[in-house]
Amino acid sequence: MSDDTKSPHEETHGLNRRGFLGASALTGAAALVGASALGSAVVGREARAAGKGERSKAEVAPGELDEYYGFWSGGHSGEVRVLGVPSMRELMRIPVFNVDSATGWGLTNESKRVLGDSARFLNGDCHHPHISMTDGKYDGKYLFINDKANSRVARIRLDVMKCDRIVTIPNVQAIHGLRLQKVPHTRYVFCNAEFIIPHPNDGSTFDLSGDNAFTLYNAIDAETMEVAWQVIVDGNLDNTDMDYSGRFAASTCYNSEKAVDLGGMMRNERDWVVVFDIPRIEAEIKAKRFVTLGDSKVPVVDGRRKDGKDSPVTRYIPVPKNPHGLNTSPDGKYFIANGKLSPTCTMIAIERLGDLFAGKLADPRDVVVGEPELGLGPLHTTFDGRGNAYTTLFIDSQLVKWNLADAVRAYKGEKVDYIRQKLDVQYQPGHNHATLCETSEADGKWIVVLSKFSKDRFLPTGPLHPENDQLIDISGEEMKLVHDGPTFAEPHDCILARRDQIKTRKIWDRKDPFFAETVKRAEKDGIDLMKDNKVIREGNKVRVYMVSMAPSFGLTEFKVKQGDEVTVTITNLDEIEDVTHGFVMVNHGVCMEISPQQTSSITFVADKPGVHWYYCSWFCHALHMEMCGRMLVEKA
């Protein structure tokens, strides 16, 4: 259907579904954009869905495996989800910042050690999952994820798909954008703190306009998961990315005004991309030219402009107002800043940044080599490795394919159409990711577009709707939509890796550090975790040790006193993959997973006298129902 043709619904009611969504978005932003996007599209406005034969490329037959792993942020569910691509089948959920009843994450002693002091928070808001790299390629060792809600960053071991470290970032609020050092390997995890706060933030002032109100750019040591350094910036920080040399990182800023309301944050016609020179930051720290803030010992370097002069470690590149996504092209040539309130994307030539820092360029805008007009509400850009970029247009509800080289030519004044195609998506897309797109191996096979609204695409589920993650075939010249995938609240982003890049364990290693502290506790008690079924009392603290082998626990009953603090430690002796056991103490809020060769423990108070049954919560055997026992609690 062309734009000029009205549907019967439009004739009757004035607006169709797409028109309503577009009008709603434009109400809040069109006046701020100030210009319509130009450029032609190869296909029309209506979604180009793949035919049946083409859709079969995304079908994975029963018993067959997907070509890619996909790791989805779980948004404010606080978890990470693992999907197979292209089937879009959910394979696993990895609890991170949330409490998970199925596995006992947030309840077990092992998970509480990982959560540390932040275990007091029962929520999280995951946005940006990223896989560790070596030489610009995924090495499959770790996945890192941010928590915007409680200013944390977590690391997930991909061999066992479990979170093993969490760090709370000091001196900041709301960790949002997160990216990794790509070469020579992931030594740093870079993350943006979004909101400006006063320093010290102790209630002595609420003024955010002065020099003592700011936010910081943060670098985390990927191995120790300790904050290595921080950089004070002008304005705020949104999204970030790293180059392929290890020297430059860049972040978008949408609040250069340091405003506290919507109108104020959109006042300036230009905001900026701030570029960080990583070796220069390290040199400043080595030379002791840093401060610390509050009780934190993290080195803090000042990256703000002073008296019109740049700092040694940062440069600020003006771009159209309120930019959002920041993406590095897989050839290492460009940082792409997505306009959001401008219909443009700004292409920053990474090779010119050295001259910018050296003072050889008169204007920081001299590093800009392209600024294509793409459509309304460009948010994020991904790449196919063949010289094309794909940008989500939130207001237009489209994915636009455009050519990087042609956009550069157009910026120089040539009459060239850089737009290859526009594809309707459903509806209001945010992040998008192509297969291997954040590495030098981008292969241009699939794109996942994470659309924020599903509206009428699925069976109704009441007032709360799922989001819609759409799979698009980009292997040919034309983009083709092949799959709609409903997702629960609220994935922001995903990352896609080849299945051969992720090496998982089938059963636990008995020497695994995940439960090493629990093993040490048992050794101190003289317990052999592979055979002993014993109860150790130390005052009112009782430690219950048992083994399990489907379909039985090593102890079918144990006795404690009312008010005792009870720690149950179980070791699963099964050596066959997928024979996971569980432990639930009825009416005590106690549940945990014990996978093959794993040791798990959980602590609770036996506050009710009487007989209390426990059972295996995972169906591990035909006699699963009989796998149970009793805690006998003597009245105090």
Curated annotation (Swiss-Prot):
The keyword Calcium applies. Belongs to the NosZ family. In the C-terminal section; belongs to the cytochrome c oxidase subunit 2 family. Cu cation Z1 binds at H324, H380. It comes from the Bacteria. Residues 540-636 are annotated as: COX2-like. Binds 2 calcium ions per subunit. Binds 6 Cu cations per subunit. Each subunit contains 2 copper centers; Cu(A) (binuclear) and Cu(Z) (tetranuclear). Cu(Z) is thought to be the site of nitrous oxide reduction. Its EC number is 1.7.2.4. Ca(2+) 1 binds at K452, E467. Cu cation Z3 binds at H128, H431. It catalyses: N2 + 2 Fe(III)-[cytochrome c] + H2O = nitrous oxide + 2 Fe(II)-[cytochrome c] + 2 H(+). It is an enzyme of class 1 (oxidoreductase). Cu cation A1 binds at H581, C616, C620, M627. Homodimer. CDD domains: N2OR_C (cd04223). Residues 302-322 are annotated as: Disordered. Keywords: Calcium, Copper, Metal-binding, Oxidoreductase, Periplasm, Signal. Residues 302-312 have a biased composition (Basic and acidic residues). Cu cation A2 binds at C616, W618, C620, H624. It comes from Pseudomonas aeruginosa (strain ATCC 15692 / DSM 22644 / CIP 104116 / JCM 14847 / LMG 12228 / 1C / PRS 101 / PAO1). Ca(2+) 2 binds at Y254, E257, M265, D271, N322. This is Nitrous-oxide reductase. Its main location: periplasm.
